[in-house]
UniProtKB/Swiss-Prot annotation:
Protein name: Mitogen-activated protein kinase homolog NTF3
Family: Belongs to the protein kinase superfamily. CMGC Ser/Thr protein kinase family. MAP kinase subfamily.
Organism: Nicotiana tabacum (Common tobacco)
Phosphotyrosine modified-residue sites: 193
GO molecular function: ATP binding; MAP kinase activity; protein serine kinase activity; protein serine/threonine kinase activity
Amino acid sequence: MATPVEPPNGIRTPGKHYYSMWQSLFEIDTKYVPIKPIGRGAYGIVCSSVNRETNEKVAIKKINNAFENRIDALRTLRELKLLRHLRHENVIALKDVMMPIHRRSFKDVYLVYELMDTDLHQIIKSSQTLSNDHCQYFLFQLLRGLKYLHSANILHRDLKPGNLLINANCDLKICDFGLARTSSGKDQFMTEYVVTRWYRAPELLLCCDNYGTSIDVWSVGCIFAELLGRKPVFPGTECLNQLKLIINILGSQREEDIEFIDNPKARKYIKSLPYSPGTPFSRLYPHAHPLAIDLLQRMLVFDPSKRISVIEALQHPYMSPLYDPNTDPPAQVPINLDIDEDLGEETIREMMWSEILEYHPEAATAAMEVVL
């Protein structure tokens, strides 16, 4: 449990209380009690809590020094802008963003999400038995959430087991939208924070300029294979090794299947790899349902133009017991996520402040009155 502490300057801010957790100060709204640490990483610290006003269990993520690294700050801003518009049962809900005390100098950001029990990475590496029904239900929910994102013109671009949150009912929600982009975006994909290599589509590994929703489908295929085999299907050590592992399993590609590679050096590299007949997925996953194997091999297709789409995957016979298109509406409007990658710290802070105000209409009204 977190330890209640006095504020660092001895002055309490109305509506806030203070906790120490893993040598970090949490300055949070008094409606959230108690708080208990549940995880930490490069992104910050996450704790569980209860909203006293709604009695709802939540996860509070504190992002320390949110503007110290510009790329991290842009990721946070992108997630805020996106999640404000998304409403789907297979996409994590951002419930609140705590109001900072000082508009022009706040450093930390507190995001409040619905609370989930674990993630798919933890489940895959556990000793828990995963039946065909489990695999089918997880895949169905992932595809459903992804169909909604793609209907909003959003590419997730970082799908992996650790970004799929699960609760005790086996409900699945997609999270971590810091790398998401609009599918029409012209920005540079290969930032210094690239998508986890093991789930990266061939067209990204080969630095192709034109990529689309099929990159997310490839990631889903990798995740599905990992569910079936309880280990990553393409655990590459670096980019070229990743491509070798893919060719070893899918087999050497025909000339027509590498026409999408617009980089001559990349195409030459693929053609230089030793011939591989490939390994059938039915041999890799002998206990998997035949329809699961059929769907998997339609998702893990080297040429993105021949890869199955999310809607086609949901209509596949393996998904038919679960999928009802009439209960699966698309997003209301496409979302524009284009953000200037060259924004400075102060501009990002101001844009983030504007996003936070969306969760606090009373503060937004007060700010307008001050301006007037």
